[in-house]
From Swiss-Prot:
Subunit structure, as described in the record: The APC/C is composed of at least 13 subunits: apc1, apc2, nuc2, apc4, apc5, cut9, apc8, apc10, apc11, hcn1, apc13, apc14 and apc15.
Gene Ontology terms: cellular component: anaphase-promoting complex; ascus epiplasm; cytoplasm
Cell compartment(s), UniProt: Ascus epiplasm
Record keyword S-adenosyl-L-methionine present: no
Top-level division of the source organism's lineage: Eukaryota
Disulfide bonds: none
Keyword annotations: Cell cycle, Cell division, Mitosis, Ubl conjugation pathway
Function per UniProt: Component of the anaphase promoting complex/cyclosome (APC/C), a cell cycle-regulated E3 ubiquitin-protein ligase complex that controls progression through mitosis and the G1 phase of the cell cycle. The APC/C is thought to confer substrate specificity and, in the presence of ubiquitin-conjugating E2 enzymes, it catalyzes the formation of protein-ubiquitin conjugates that are subsequently degraded by the 26S proteasome. Appears to play a role in spore wall formation.
Lineage: Eukaryota, Fungi, Dikarya, Ascomycota, Taphrinomycotina
Phenotype reported upon loss of the gene: Abnormal spore wall formation. Abnormal spore wall polysaccharide composition during sporulation. Irregular spore wall thickness.
Protein name: Anaphase-promoting complex subunit 14
Gene Ontology biological process terms in this record: anaphase-promoting complex-dependent catabolic process; cell division; mitotic sister chromatid separation
Source organism: Schizosaccharomyces pombe (strain 972 / ATCC 24843) (Fission yeast)
């Protein structure tokens, strides 16, 4: 028997729609869905995932910056006429790493 046929006992989506329509028209101003219950463990898990996303975002941004500087150095190195620019880019790159090492040493 076809459940979507128009004759007989129909278990189509229309009957569910009628149920939802009756519930929505019942005059009850409160929504049927309740707020989810958050346990302390759940809030700790949420804080952990937010922390992980922040740390992961900073690490990804740092990797993108390092990759961009490596690409810039390789492009400058590929053109022979720009030796001073190449040296300057290398010095900037090394300066960044030295600054990072200084920050880690202070930590």
């Amino acid at each position: 028997m076809d459940p979507f046929a128009g004759t007989g006992q129909s278990k189509s989506y229309r009957t569910f729609g009628n149920v939802f329509q009756r519930l929505s028209m019942s005059g009850n101003p409160k929504p049927l869905a309740k707020k989810p219950l958050l346990l302390p463990e759940a809030s700790k898990a949420i804080e952990f995932w937010n922390y992980r996303d922040v740390i992961g975002g900073e690490e990804a941004e740092q990797e993108r910056n390092e990759r961009a500087s490596r690409i810039a150095i390789s492009r400058i190195a590929s053109s022979r006429s720009s030796i001073p620019e190449y040296r300057q880019a290398i010095m900037q790159h090394l300066t960044k790493h030295v600054q990072q090492l200084d920050q880690l040493a202070e930590w």
